Curated annotation (Swiss-Prot):
It comes from Arabidopsis thaliana. Belongs to the group II decarboxylase family. Sphingosine-1-phosphate lyase subfamily. Disruption phenotype: No visible phenotype under normal growth conditions. It is a single-pass type III membrane protein. Residues 51-544 are cytoplasmic. Pathway: Lipid metabolism; sphingolipid metabolism. One of its GO terms (biological process) is carboxylic acid metabolic process. One of its GO terms (molecular function) is pyridoxal phosphate binding. The modification N6-(pyridoxal phosphate)lysine is found at K349. Its EC number is 4.1.2.27. This is Sphingosine-1-phosphate lyase. Its main location: endoplasmic reticulum. Cleaves phosphorylated sphingoid bases (PSBs), such as sphingosine-1-phosphate, into fatty aldehydes and phosphoethanolamine. May play a minor role in maintenance of sphingolipid metabolism during normal plant development and growth, but be required for maintaining sphingoid long chain bases (LCB) and their phosphorylated derivatives (LCB-P) levels when sphingolipid metabolism is perturbed. May play a role in dehydration stress.
Amino acid sequence: MDSFSYSSMKSMLIQARGSLNSRLSEFEPLVLLLVPLVSLFLAQIIGSVFGVVHEKGLKACLIGFIMGLLKMIPGVQNYIDAEKQKVVDQLQSGSSSKKKNKTEVLPVKGLGVEVLEKMENEKRNDAIWQGKCSGTVYIGGAESEGHFSLINQACSMFAHTNPLHIDVFQSVVRFESEVVAMTAALLGSKETASGGQICGNMTSGGTESIVLAVKSSRDYMKYKKGITRPEMIIPESGHSAYDKAAQYFKIKLWRVPVDKDFRADVKATRRHINRNTIMIVGSAPGFPHGIIDPIEELGQLALSYGICFHVDLCLGGFVLPFARKLGYQIPPFDFSVQGVTSISVDVHKYGLAPKGTSTVLYRNHEIRKHQFVAVTEWSGGLYVSPTIAGSRPGSLVAGAWAAMMSLGEEGYLQNTSKIMEASKRLEEGVREIHELFVIGKPDMTIVAFGSKALDIFEVNDIMSSKGWHLNALQRPNSIHICITLQHVPVVDDFLRDLREAVETVKANPGPITGGLAPIYGAAGKMPDRGMVNELLVSFMDSQY
């Protein structure tokens, strides 16, 4: 029976082959060669189109396609470019006039110490930032001059040093190691749950810390799981540094919506996880609204899928540990949370170190080693570097160490008490203005607010005219202030000016001369995000 079935099947296959060959004999060999190749090519195109639609959404793809067709019409592209230039000119707000006397060649004869006088004159053109800027400068009060003086002395002592030369400048190498260790101790390195291997390096800022964490996670996941088409998932409140990292390292980035409380949506994050996912992200707190994401839940999610989980503590690293000690109800956020593999912390924000100092921390050395770049085949010798920069300013490392050692735990506790109390007072004051609403429930020192009754960007323009420098946000349209020690004595002034700004917009709605409300409003509503992207690039290009 088996032999009969086999012979019958063989006979049927021979007959089918003969019939197929007979039919195909009607076509030229070249056609038979091209058809499968063209089919494969079309399949790849269709697959790519579906991938783009899946990533960007059907609406965004259609808008982009239509705008591309419109730009092909004679005159349309020129019109768009002209309108774009008008917006760029308005955004510059007179900064072009400051470029008229720009020095472009070396002076024939050096200025000597006179250069300091020239620098003092230039400094007078800076905006008045004392107490008026959101974030930006984090030290304040009567003690600020003393702190600045101490930092400047520390930086001056080590202005010639470079941690790249480990054998020469052992002092700043030690300083860096101790800054990392002290920062890690604030974030759970001494707790059993951390695993006892927390390590890291200093970087130039929060962006480099995040970029390095992404790079290390990508390479670690390639080593552990063989992932070659990496993807990462971040909440839409996640910092734009992740977009940079995604562009630099060819990682597909998924931005998922936040929940109704403006925290990372764990369920939405889970839905986007697949076999190519290398990492997920949380913030403590997020830059836009000062709200801490559900770090514990995200940590469990990362653990269950065996992927990396980075926590952005650039703002909260030198506040949340002390706020918790002061009795504030702070949800878990550090290495005590299982699943957290890396953390970024800025020392130059609430750590009160000189600008250009941050840290990136890892749960263990196995992950961190993927941050390093080692070169063995260079004619210049064997080379290894821990961060993106080769040479690094040892002066900033020394300044950060001096800031942390001079303030100590007591100093940071006192500072945290002041700014947390100021933040709560400011938040309560904003809530009392009926035309405004506070976004979510801020966990730290950022208060974001919008309005259903007014154009919030017009309110921002009025505040700008009063000397305040606040941050404009989108989705929803809003503005925020990041409270620092600079703001502790001026909370009442801020609330008074804010009430007046609201009343002014109520009485006279509409943009003010030179205001940016129309631009912010239009950018938020513009469906073609590619055009907004071009606008931002044109503006940045005009600044340098």
